[in-house]
Amino acid sequence: MTYTISRAEQVLQTQRQALNLRWYPHYHLAARAGWINDPNGLVWFDGWYHAFYQHHPYSTQWGPMHWGHARSKDLVHWEHLPVALAPEGPEDKDGCFSGSAVVDGDTLELIYTGHKFHGDPGDEANLYQVQCLATSRDGIHFERQGMVVDTPPGMHHFRDPKVWREGDCWYMIVGAREGDTGQVRLYRSADLRQWQDAGVLDEAESTMGYMWECPDFFTLNGKRVLMFSPQGMQAAGFSNRNLFQSGYLIGEWQPGQRFIRHGEFREMDNGHDFYAPQSFSTPDGRRIVIGWLDMWESPLPEQQDGWAGMLSLPRELSLSADDRLQMRPAKEVESLRGAWFPWPVSTLNNQQTTMVDNCEAMEVNLRWDCARSSAEQYGLRFGDGLRIYMDAQQQRLVLERHYPQYGLCGTRSVPLTAGADLNLRIFFDSSSVEVFVNDGEACLSSRIYPQAPRRELALFAWSGAAALTEAGAWQLE
């Protein structure tokens, strides 16, 4: 098949009309139809926030990657734009893989991975991944400039460039695999076209994965943050439970030096579905991150409905006093709020109480006084398939989903400080939940698949009492 932007647009127009919207998001960004995965090219340009994304418009399965495109004035209300890149070759004939965007003067520049096979695609020895450039003056139509960084000798997995400006130079990091070792490689340039190899910024130790995808590198509170998505890390206890992870290292770096780590790798989001996050800086200097709200090799029931995958809410990043990355919903998310429904504040004693009969798009705010709560489990139930609760015996907040008909069952959890209040902001959309714990202390994000009409929200406390001190919900529009 020959891939072009015009052909992709024709297919999307047709497929959009046939969608089943039962699980399609109300306020998260998803493709018009077809497949979406990694967010790409997050940037502010010419008065708009732009979000590109990995996209296969021809089916709900992963396939030759295009770059989908949307823009927004406020990070929450998105306008779909034409597909920005199609794998038209020769450098990207088998896919336009992930990358980033920068503004150079009056030009928006996309730096992305050209994915191609020289020979049988079933033989990894034939895989080549190179870094390519495309430019635009209007932010919508892009002119392909071809390859700007070739594959290092002997390497096959070399993808997901992230570019930034520092001093008089442009810098690029690229995720790579050297044998069975994940690494991040560094390049520098004066003009975004001629790049010099600056060596390896950092690489995995034996337990840190065979491939580091989607790297990002930025400064918070004077510290350098290396964010990436490692493949090949083994689960250990409550950690690394997903097939692949997304997390970060904190450290120091100066141009011309190697990254010096301070501390260990930490996961960013402890839910079932969060991968390939990318960050960018807003005009007022905030660092915002958006991730793919799904996980590789996990069932996607919405594929039968004509679409697959979605992106997370925009989240503002900060660094805690003990150098932990914190995520909170970007302030723009509050513009979605409609009516406020206060819930009665009370002590629940071995009971369950329905608060909302039909939750489609809501933000729920809860505060529990854990010191005055004796229940073994207390929290929130959504329909028949989701519970978000405090497990007092383990001192952990648990997200439990149970959709056996789709093969989606299991728990994810984070530790909590004994006796402290538990403050939750929980965002429900048609097929997703994002839980923000204690103003950025932790986050759990998962896809959910409730069956109509079982979308009620209920508070519960079992084997004892639980003290609820603040409660209510915003209708999101």
Where are these regions (language model features)?
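Repeated scaffold domains used in trafficking and secretory/extracellular systems
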Residues: 213-215, 277
